[in-house]
Every structure is written in C-alpha cells, then in structure tokens.
C-alpha cells in the first residue's frame, strides 16, 4: 500500500477499493499509510466494496462464514462513522449477480436484501441520531445488460425501492440520505468470443441504460473491453472503452436535458412490474430471516435463472448475433496476430514472493506477533476489528497473516453451489442424450460418474455450475463441491468417487500450471485413463498446450451448446480404456 500510493497525497484523493472479505484489512493499510503521510484521517474520502453476501452468491472471494463476515462489514461502517465520516463503508454490488444469471427482479431484490441485512446489523453499533447519515453512505454498484430499456427501467425501480425502504423501514426523513447512489459496469456475461468486434456495440448500447434517464443516471460508469471473452485486454482496448464514455459525455447533448422518460406510460408500467417482482422476492427472503439466512435459496435461484438464459440461447429463443444467428463473418483484423490479448508476466509471482520475503525480514517479529494477538482477541471478544487491524498494519503484518487469524477465529466457509443432486424440470429435449448416458452406464455397470472441479483461486463458478447441472439433467451422477480446490483435492476426489470423466473450469488465466500439475498427479495415482476436459478463457495456443498435456477436450465461450459438450463426455467415457485391475 505504501508503494502504491508513494508521492500521492491520500488526503486529496477519493479512492475506491473493490475489496470484500479483507475490506477491514485493506482499509487499515490505507489508514496506516495516510497517517504515515501526516494526513488528517477524518478528511479521507473513498469506498470499500465490503459486500460479502454477493461473494457467496457469485464471485467467490470469501473467507469466513456469513455471520462473522457480516459483523466485520458493520465493524468497518461503525469505525468510518466515527473516524472517517466522508468514507463510504459499503458498496452493495449487484453487478456480479447479473453476471451469475440474475433476472432484473432478482438483481433488485438480492441487492436490496443485502443492504438491509447490513443496516439491520449496524443499528446497534452507531448512535441512533447518526443512523440516517450512515444509511446515506451506502452506495451501490450495478450491472446493465443488452435489453437496455428494461435495464433503464430497472434503475428507476432501484431508485424508487431504495427511497421506499429508507423511509419506511428505517425512518430516514432527509431525502439526501435516501438517495440511490450508484456506479455501474455494463454486462460482461454477454460479450462473445465469436465476432468479438460486435461487443463494441453491445457495450455502447448497454451504457445507454444507465445514462439516458437523468433521474436514474449512474454517478460513475466503467466499461469492459471488447475482447474480454478472448483473454486479458490490452491498455489500448481499455482506452477504446474509455473513449466511448468521453464521446457520450462531451460530444452528445444527452446531459443537457431533464429526464426524457418521466410520465411515459410504457416505462411506468415496466417499472411497476419490476418493483412488484422485486417485492415478492424481498418478502420471500424476509420470511427466511433475511439475506444471510437465505444465501442458499438465492444461490439456487441464480443457478436456475442462468440455466434458463443459456437454454434460451441454445434453442434460439434468445438471439445473440454471431453466436446462434448471423454466424457467417469475414475474418476480423482486430484479432489477428499474437498480440491480440495481453499475456500475464510469468515472472510476476516469483518477484512478488521475493519482495514479500524481503518485507518480512525487515520488520520487528515481536511487534508483529503482538499485533496479531490483538486482532485475534478482538475477533474472539466482539471488539471492533478495525482498531487492532490498523495497529497491525503499522507494524508490517501481511494480508495473508491477517486472513489466517480471522480464518482461525471464525472458521473457513464453503458456500452453497446452487446445484442440487435432483434433476430440474428442464429435461425436455434431453431424451436422446439421456438414452446415451443410460447405455454407457449399463456398459460400465454403474451410473456414469462426472466430477466437476474448479482448481485455483478463481471464484467465477457460472460455467462449472451450468455444466454440472446439465450433466445431472442428462442422467449423469455428478460431484461438484464448488470453488477453490487444489489439484490434490480434485485427484483425491476422482479416486474416491471412481470418476469416469473429470471436468475443470478455470477463468483465472492459470490453466497451464494448474492443469499441468493435476495431470501429473492423475498419472501418479494411476488415474491417467480418466478423460479430463477443461473449460475457460483459453487462447488457442494454450489449448494446444493443454491437449499436449493429455487433456481430451478444451472448451471456450464459443462452445455455448451444452448438449454438444454432454455428447462429447459420453463419447469420451465410452471410448476410454478401463482402469487396470
């Protein structure tokens, strides 16, 4: 943190940190650096995302169980009220909910339920007279998809529902504290690997949803790069997205007019329908005891909604240009050559480990251990975790060490996968594949066993969930234990479950080292006969390397027909040699 903000006066900055499970710690580091600079901490401005509930539902960067994690969220909020009054202690993030398949009604409801869970917990931690101002410091980070009229109506619904909740649930009288403050990144889920140049238009259209309506306009907009379905965007790609915003803001006349949609009956009807659907979901969540108690319910709803979305693309009910219609295309000069995407520096990890070792060698170990014990005691006794965390930051405690302490205090958590063992009601049209699965299962003498795994730290689980759910509906016996598995854990599970095929999902870019390690361990355990398939954001050169390691099939976003993948799996198992006796 000190290196990052070297010669940058934090007292004059407004810093936003997309950090969740370790939000108390990152804010502590920031405060420690600000104090080193001689800053007046009360003048610090910024935001920590600090939304752990969406991590359980969609993004996966959680550490501890929900209840102690909620406690740490409100510890941050209570501390900022007293010491950093200009800081936004939470940015409720519905962006990832839509990326995980949420309908507009679900995005509205799940985000608002998250906000109320936090505010309900915060009530006892701040003086009553200061609570309305704390409500006013809650901000949101939302998504905007291609159906931009519906998305614009969703934003108007967000504004109205939040005002209603603040007034009726929390008794906030000042309209300033009931304002729905939000930033946005438009949808990445809909960006396509096929004809990726079309993504430029998708991104621009999606931006309209959060800019056209003045009364529901985003305070901040960030746009993905056109080639994110291919790999990591280059600086030039990111610049192109920035230019879209600048042209919209400075060349058009959009910002010169009042709201263009006030009084429009079609818009009013859609907003009312979205609010009605969101209220029904909110009532369901409240009946379960709130967002924390309803995590498993919300996760299953997201998996089901995403399955419906994918089936719509597969059966042609939802048109995606270049994917399931208008597939003929000229070769794009934008994707030609080896430098069409950015490749991570292979030496970065070793460099970071070396710098970490140097850092640890230079600090006072006695002071570090004393500080960690203070964090441990705060976690155990319910004292605000921020106070000892700031002291720990000052003596050089690392993020990993802080995380180890809270993990030991509160426990390690595995979130629900949203994929049940029971088939869904979406088996229509799967009869032929189910018959193939039955036939192969008969030959095997037991049900075809498919192990789905997500190795590494990648928490984006949509693909793994949908593959597991479709395989289940096709009649396979599935095992899917969720995210953050080590190669050792996957190999152990493959052996224990006597898997017939292993499927791995990796979207972090670390597919080469992780798959290389896993394939070696599979062979060492006598499991080299089991076919392994891999899916993710995988450039073709890397796909060739994976196949050379022994991977049977490699899938990327262009392989959107899940039934085709299921047929491949059946064929691989049918052709695979039996294990040696």
Pin down the residues of each PLM region:
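Catalytic alpha/beta active-site cores
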Residues: 1-145, 150-151, 169, 176-185, ...
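Secondary-structure transition/capping motifs at alpha-helix termini
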Residues: 6-13, 32-45, 78-88, 117-136, ...
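Short beta-alpha connecting loops at secondary-structure transitions
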Residues: 15, 54-64, 97-101, 142-147, ...
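Mobile "lid/hinge" segments at catalytic clefts and subdomain interfaces of large enzymes
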Residues: 51-53, 69-125, 201-282, 288, ...
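Short beta-strand/loop segments at the ligand-binding rim of alpha/beta enzyme cores
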Residues: 178-182, 446-449, 525-534
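Flexible, glycine-rich loop/tail regions that form catalytic "lids" or insertion modules at the edges
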Residues: 234-235, 241-246, 250-432, 487, ...
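Cofactor-cradling patches in redox/metallo enzymes
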Residues: 464-570, 574
């Amino acid at each position: 943190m000190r290196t990052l903000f070297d010669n940058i006066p934090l007292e004059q900055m407004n810093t936003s940190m997309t950090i969740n499970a370790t939000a108390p710690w990152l804010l502590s580091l920031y405060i420690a650096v600000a104090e080193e600079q001689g800053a007046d901490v009360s003048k610090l401005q910024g935001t920590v995302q600090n939304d752990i509930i969406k991590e359980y539902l969609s993004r996966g960067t959680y550490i501890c169980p929900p209840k102690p994690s909620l406690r740490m969220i409100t510890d941050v909020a209570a501390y900022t009220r007293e010491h950093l009054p200009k800081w936004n202690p939470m940015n409720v993030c519905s962006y990832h909910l839509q990326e995980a398949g949420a309908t507009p009604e679900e995005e509205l409801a799940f985000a608002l339920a998250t906000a109320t869970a936090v505010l309900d917990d915060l009530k006892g931690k701040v003086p009553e007279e200061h609570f309305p101002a704390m409500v006013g410091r809650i901000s949101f980070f939302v998504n905007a998809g291609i159906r931009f009229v519906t998305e614009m109506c969703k934003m108007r619904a967000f504004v109205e529902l939040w005002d209603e909740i603040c007034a009726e649930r929390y008794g906030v009288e000042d309209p300033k504290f009931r304002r729905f403050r939000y930033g946005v990144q438009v949808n990445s889920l809909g960006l396509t690997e096929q004809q990726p140049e079309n993504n430029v238009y998708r991104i621009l259209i999606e931006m309209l949803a959060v800019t056209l309506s003045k009364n529901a306009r985003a305070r901040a907009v960030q746009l993905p790069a056109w080639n994110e379905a291919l790999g990591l965007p280059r600086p030039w790609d990111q610049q192109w997205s920035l230019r879209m915003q600048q042209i919209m803001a400075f060349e058009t006349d959009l910002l010169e007019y009042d709201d263009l949609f006030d009084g429009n009956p079609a818009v009013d009807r859609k907003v009312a329908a979205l609010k009605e659907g969101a209220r029904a979901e909110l009532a369901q969540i409240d009946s379960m005891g709130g967002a924390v108690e309803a995590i498993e319910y919300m996760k299953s709803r997201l998996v089901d909604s995403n399955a419906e979305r994918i089936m719509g693309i597969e059966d042609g009910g939802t048109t995606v240009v270049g994917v399931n219609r208008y597939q003929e295309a000229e070769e794009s000069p934008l994707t030609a050559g080896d430098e069409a995407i950015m490749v991570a520096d292979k030496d970065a990890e070793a460099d970071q480990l070396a710098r970490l070792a140097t850092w640890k060698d230079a600090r006072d170990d006695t002071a570090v251990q004393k500080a960690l014990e203070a964090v441990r005691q705060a976690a155990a006794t319910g004292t605000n975790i921020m106070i000892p965390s700031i002291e720990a930051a000052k003596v050089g405690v690392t993020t990993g060490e802080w995380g180890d302490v809270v993990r030991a205090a509160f426990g390690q958590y595995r979130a629900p996968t949203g994929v049940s063992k029971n088939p869904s009601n979406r088996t229509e049209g799967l009869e032929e594949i189910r018959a193939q699965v039955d036939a192969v299962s008969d030959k095997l003498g037991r049900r075809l066993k498919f192990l789905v795994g997500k190795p590494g730290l990648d928490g984006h689980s949509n693909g793994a969930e949908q593959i597991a759910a479709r395989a289940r509906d096709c009649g396979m016996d599935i095992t899917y234990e969720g995210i953050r598995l080590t190669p050792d854990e996957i190999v152990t599970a493959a052996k224990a479950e006597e898997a017939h095929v292993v499927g791995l999902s990796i979207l972090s870019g670390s597919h080469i080292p992780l798959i290389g390690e896993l394939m070696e361990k599979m062979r060492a355990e006598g499991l080299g006969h089991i076919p392994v398939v891999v899916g993710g954001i995988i450039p073709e050169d890397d796909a060739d390397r994976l196949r050379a390691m022994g991977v049977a099939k490699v899938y990327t976003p262009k392989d959107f027909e899940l039934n085709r993948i299921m047929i491949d799996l059946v064929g691989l198992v049918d052709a695979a040699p039996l294990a040696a006796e």
